[in-house]
Amino acid sequence: MKVSIIGATGYGGLELIRLLHQHSSVDIATLHSFSAQAETLATFYPHLKDLAVSPLEKINPTEIIEKSDTVFIATPSGIAKDIALPYVDAGLNVIDLSGDFRLKDRQLYEKWYGKSAAPTEYIGKAEYGLAEFREKKETTFIANPGCYATATLLGLAPLATNKLIDPTSIIVDAKSGISGAGKVPSASTHFTETNENMTLYKMNSHQHIPEIMQQLTKWDESIPAIQFSTSLIPITRGIFTTIYVKPKNPITQKELHKLYESTYDNAPFVRIQPENVYPTVKQVTASNYCDIGLAYNEKTNVITIVSVIDNLVKGAAGQAIQNLNIMANFAESDGLRFIPVYP
């Protein structure tokens, strides 16, 4: 299969290149950038010398359609809604890593992203690509989930799909490494601001909130809202999500573990930790794994769920490739069989 990557110079695009380089059934046909053409990626990223030798090209839909079977769009939100349409119309596999097609309600997108929304027709064609819970595996147009949404939804899914949560009790405390802010530097991501520091940002206003709610209410329509906070922590990669919920009825620790283990029994990239063991960000670094730890406090009737992912892999490029594997009927783990980098 031939693929093109639009937005190849960003962190998401770079991860797609790294992972697809190991894929047994995929060849990268073309790489595209808005900011640089004619240069090779190695010009900007020396670690890719002799690996990414094709020049970066401007975006030419006719050429991309002619040369590729699949298009990955790894651009900031607000771009894919305009550039993805020709590839969808041509019947190519299209996987968008931005937020442009995730929300089915155009008004919600415009409220939370502050940009004009994609045409209704195309929003309707896109399937939300939470890989472990995809319903239409033959779909060729995927809205890849956000990093916070992936960690949160995988953490809540076993309880939410079985309608076991007290619907007003969900509290999510999510923390992200600096790469989650993207490649373009800013004052808030400057080393002197982030080193030895932790910053709360977008309190009650993060754009992944409606995305999470859209999926949660699909599983359990009684959930009215979530309390969701996001923080920036001084690590390069990783999402560390701590979720607190109350079950509708008391549950034992063993019942809780059994529920999660049975839900993810056939999910190659979700690993449930043993009882009283909680995951760290480092144990999933540079991998497509989501590791989940669980605890139940009988005194307070509170379940604590710890869900960790690499924001650039399971939270972006890795899940995008996992979605490609599902739609193309490849082995789900092809191109993703990476042992996490440690230490």
Swiss-Prot record:
Annotated pathway: Amino-acid biosynthesis; L-arginine biosynthesis; N(2)-acetyl-L-ornithine from L-glutamate: step 3/4
GO cellular component: cytoplasm
PROSITE patterns the UniProt entry points to: ARGC
Catalysed reactions listed for this entry: N-acetyl-L-glutamate 5-semialdehyde + phosphate + NADP(+) = N-acetyl-L-glutamyl 5-phosphate + NADPH + H(+)
Cellular localization per UniProt: Cytoplasm
One BP term from GO: L-arginine biosynthetic process
SUPFAM superfamilies: Glyceraldehyde-3-phosphate dehydrogenase-like, C-terminal domain (SSF55347), NAD(P)-binding Rossmann-fold domains (SSF51735)
Gene3D superfamilies (UniProt xref): Dihydrodipicolinate Reductase, domain 2 (3.30.360.10), NAD(P)-binding Rossmann-like Domain (3.40.50.720)
EC number: 1.2.1.38
Keyword 4Fe-4S: no
Presence of keyword GTP-binding: no
Alphabetical keyword list: Amino-acid biosynthesis, Arginine biosynthesis, Cytoplasm, NADP, Oxidoreductase
A GO molecular-function annotation: N-acetyl-gamma-glutamyl-phosphate reductase activity
Active-site positions on this chain: C147
HAMAP family according to UniProt: ArgC_type1
Function, as annotated: Catalyzes the NADPH-dependent reduction of N-acetyl-5-glutamyl phosphate to yield N-acetyl-L-glutamate 5-semialdehyde.
Similarity remark: Belongs to the NAGSA dehydrogenase family. Type 1 subfamily.
Name this protein carries in UniProt: N-acetyl-gamma-glutamyl-phosphate reductase
